[in-house]
Amino acid sequence: PKTELQKQIVKLSGKLPALTEKQRRWGIMNAMDHVGLRLKKGLITCTHCGKIFYDLMKLEDGEMDICPNCGTHLKIETTTRKSCRDNEYFNIITTCHGFQVFRYFYIRKEFHSGKEASYCIREVVQNWMSADGKFKTMALLANMHSYYRDAWCLGTDLEIRANDKEAYHIGCDACYPVRRYLSAWKKYGFKGKVHSIYALDFFRLISTDSTAETLLKAGQYELLRMFCAGKGYEIKRTWPTIKICMRNNYVVKDTSMWFDYLDLLGDEGKDLRNAHYVCPDNLNSAHDFYMERKRRKEEKERRQRDMKQMEALKKYEKEYEKLKSRFFDLNISDGNIIIVPLKSLDEFRQEGQIMHHCVFTNNYFRKKDSLILSARIGEKHIETIE
């Protein structure tokens, strides 16, 4: 530690309570995915307690069962394996002398058939955040490159590390349910929930970015999740429209559909600051309505392009007939499959559309030394032959 703040954090870190047995047990049971190793004859080995029991329910792989010995929920896997290893994380959110502290614990599990699983749990990262959103990181030394998340040097100590190293940013879903928060967060609109956002990112953004703070206070949790997920550019781009929604107490619940809907409105030239358009009573219906309008418009434009293209290519129609008309009566059949030549540009276009290839768009009718035929069974086109 070099600065007074760093020295203070190091001192306070040493005063944090050790992991309790209750917290340890919670992490093992809730952060880890426990597997039931099932043999083909139906015997299941619990990879937590090591006991063996019979599969009475004939479960599919991936379905859950409960070990009758220890009560652990097991994901069933049919295999001949007799051992397994796994790594996972859980975190504890607490406070210490005016800091919001995020403590991350690394769990390493090793299991061998006939024995109980062994677990190694080590605290690997601490993020110390002040009420202004600035934070310092204490962590163990991480091996290899910055993007290796599980290569910890478990023999090292927690020390002040660089905030920007990817290994120290742990996206952890398992969060111990007993949490303590700074009262300072209330002024940013925090009411006890982080709304499925990683807590470190959540508090950092609401305290340093007025956009995130406004979204939280307005109850726009889906937009806030999108903002915290690195899509702030979309929020900034449509901020005037979002403000109209907030002014009219309209909550965006499906961000993907709503932003797609805004793009459709933009294509129609609609006013994106008009609540009548941007705050629909039924987003699904409004989205489908404008999607259908766009589809019809594109279909009309496509037909116009095709007509213009056909007009431009009409000059090749007579040339094609002159060169290939001698083959137009050709009919090859085995009684089931019929093979006939394409006789006009319209037939080339239809063949390309039906078979989804480029026989028309790449002007195969202009090839002087080739004949294009269509193989069919009844009305069904099955192959195009050159």
Regions found by a protein language model. Give the residues of each.
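N-terminal alpha-helical interaction blocks
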Residues: P1-L37
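Short, flexible, mixed-charge glycine/proline-rich loop motifs
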Residues: N30-L43, D55-G62
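Cys/His-enriched microdomains
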Residues: G42-T47, D65-P68, L371
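Cys/His-rich microdomains that often coordinate metals
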Residues: G50-Y54, G71-L74
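Cysteine-rich micro-motifs
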Residues: L59-I76
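Short metal-binding segments enriched for Cys and/or His
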Residues: T72-E88
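Non-catalytic protein-protein interaction scaffold segments in large eukaryotic complex-forming proteins
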Residues: I107-R122, W128-V252
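Catalytic-core elements of nucleic-acid end-processing and repair enzymes
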Residues: R204-E386
